[in-house]
């Protein structure tokens, strides 16, 4: 497994792979890898000849400096996991390598609408940072496919739109959420939970599933469903942050013509902001 930290060396390797006619898959990550990331890697391996995993804690997508400072950097352990998975290339650049003149004056990519709604409204600049780094990685790696987790539902929708709008010839693969046995969605942020909070955390998925059951049973008073869900989260020990029921295809408000809904839930548990989602067919 090659570990590359600089743009010139990465370009050199990508040129070689292209000359050899290899099909390349990219899995962009911020490191602190868990089994959910490994599922992305496995999906990439099944679809391509060569798998490139990027590990970069992107300062442009953090709206709070303290979150950036405390995000775990576990490069050695991450590389060991990826090596066991037989990943071909890890791209692990420094911030200076990606943003040589800092982030303030760096050219950015913005996806209007999707970048400022829902999660984007509570995390200003976050999605602009995501679309900027992902587009840069696409330009550098030139993958045939790229794999992203469906846990970050809005991020996946944003990347799909960016790819369509910018004309990237890249297949975007959404990989289903991987959960612990108790239902908790795997996330790097789960590492912020204390042992006691970890016992409470599966309650998020239980509330999410309860909303889904109500929708599938034909309930359509969304305001009431959301209010009750928020109360249930707070009773379980969470601080409900945002609960939304949206059209799964547009992320706009659910309408009479909506065929699928996505339930998006965000809640604080101690210092960890947990997010999860679930899709529901609207008959």
Swiss-Prot record:
(R)-pantoate binds at residues 61, 155. It is an enzyme of class 6 (ligase). Coiled coil: none annotated. Beta-alanine binds at residue 61. ATP binds at residues 30-37, 149-152, 186-189. GO terms for biological process: pantothenate biosynthetic process. It is found in: Cytoplasm. It catalyses: (R)-pantoate + beta-alanine + ATP = (R)-pantothenate + AMP + diphosphate + H(+). GO terms for molecular function: ATP binding; pantoate-beta-alanine ligase activity. The active site is at residue 37. Pfam families: Pantoate_ligase. Belongs to the pantothenate synthetase family. Catalyzes the condensation of pantoate with beta-alanine in an ATP-dependent reaction via a pantoyl-adenylate intermediate. Homodimer. This is Pantothenate synthetase. It comes from Shigella flexneri.
């Amino acid at each position: 497994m090659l570990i590359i930290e600089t743009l010139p060396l990465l370009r050199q390797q990508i040129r070689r792979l292209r000359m050899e006619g290899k099909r390349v898959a990219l899995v962009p990550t911020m490191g602190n890898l868990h089994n959910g990331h490994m599922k992305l890697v496995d999906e990439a391996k099944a679809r391509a000849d060569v798998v490139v995993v990027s590990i970069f804690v992107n300062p442009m997508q953090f709206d709070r400096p303290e979150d950036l400072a405390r995000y775990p950097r576990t490069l050695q352990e991450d590389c060991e996991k990826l090596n066991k998975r037989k990943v071909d290339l890890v791209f692990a650049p420094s911030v200076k390598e990606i943003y040589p003149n800092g982030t303030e004056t760096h050219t950015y990519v913005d996806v209007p609408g999707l970048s400022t709604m829902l999660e984007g409204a509570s995390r200003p600049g976050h999605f602009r940072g995501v679309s900027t780094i992902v587009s840069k990685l696409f330009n550098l790696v030139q993958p045939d496919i790229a794999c992203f987790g469906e846990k970050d539902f809005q991020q996946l929708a944003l990347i799909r739109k960016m790819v369509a709008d910018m004309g990237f010839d890249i297949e975007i693969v959404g990989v289903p959420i991987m959960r612990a046995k108790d239902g908790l969605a795997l996330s790097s942020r789960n590492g912020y939970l204390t042992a006691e909070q970890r016992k409470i955390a599966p309650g998020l998925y239980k509330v999410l599933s309860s909303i889904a059951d109500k929708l599938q049973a034909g309930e359509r008073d969304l305001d009431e469903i959301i209010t009750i869900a928020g109360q249930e989260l707070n009773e379980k020990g969470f601080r409900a942050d945002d609960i939304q029921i949206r059209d799964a295809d547009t992320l706009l408000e659910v309408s009479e013509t909506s065929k699928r809904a996505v339930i998006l839930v965000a809640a604080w548990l101690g210092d960890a902001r947990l997010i999860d989602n679930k899709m529901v067919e609207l008959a």
